[in-house]
Amino acid sequence: SAIISENNHNSDDSVKYLNSSKFLINVHEGYLKKYVTNLVVNGEVQKSISVIKQNRNKDNSKFFEADLLLLIDNFKKKKFKKNIELLNEFERYSGYGNYEYIIYEVLKDYNDLFLSKKPSLNNDKFGQLSLINQAFQYCYLNQPEAGSVFMNIINSNQGDYSRYLFFHFNNLIKNKDFESVQQISKTINILESSLLIQQSKKWLDESDY
């Protein structure tokens, strides 16, 4: 019944069926993963994390999504040292595919950042994504380099990255650099901008900080 509900995109019913069949965790290898996934889809993220922790000693709890949820939970609770061991385990997914590998590398960079309070400057293997991560790391450290990195992203000819103006503005306002905010705002072409940037410009022009 749970599988049928899932296939019909009814995650709420699927969770109910899976809840009533939790004894299968110990006998069905894929049950725990399916249960955790449906909880997340249904918005019950904290419950999914609790279920993973309760079954952490079982082999069927060692899957990518479970480890990812535990990592995020540690980030939320600022348990960065606890993440070191988990990231060592997480590394086994780096050979699975680009998706898993990139997530592992990005999360590791951020965990290192939170522990050392230093940006990871040597990791440029992911192109624009690496540059974006670098900008946010500089923001976290409140370093002035954030501005130039954001402008490199925004002015890139590899695609439309104008949405990062929003984050650049936020960082400038946080640092009370209102003059730069107004200068950049004047260069925005409303007709060629996204709704997010249009609304941001409206707030800035009205000095609604």
Per-region residue spans from a language model:
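Alpha-helical repeat scaffolds
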Residues: D13-S20, V45-D59, F80-S94, L115-L129, ...
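Alpha-helix C-terminal capping/termination sites
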Residues: N7, V41, I72, K76-K77, ...
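Long, low-complexity, polar and repeat-rich extracellular regions
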Residues: I3-E6, K78, Q137-C139, F166-F167, ...
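N-terminal leader/linker segments that initiate helical-solenoid repeat arrays
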Residues: S1-Y35, V41, I49
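Generic helix N-cap/helix-start motif at coil->alpha-helix transitions
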Residues: S1, I25-L32, D59-L68, S94-L107, ...
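Residue-level signature for tetratricopeptide repeat
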Residues: I4, T37-N38, D73-N74, L107, ...
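Mid-chain, structured segments of secreted extracytoplasmic proteins
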Residues: E29-D73
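Alpha-helical transmembrane segments and their helix-helix packing motifs
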Residues: E65-A66, D73, K78-E85, N111
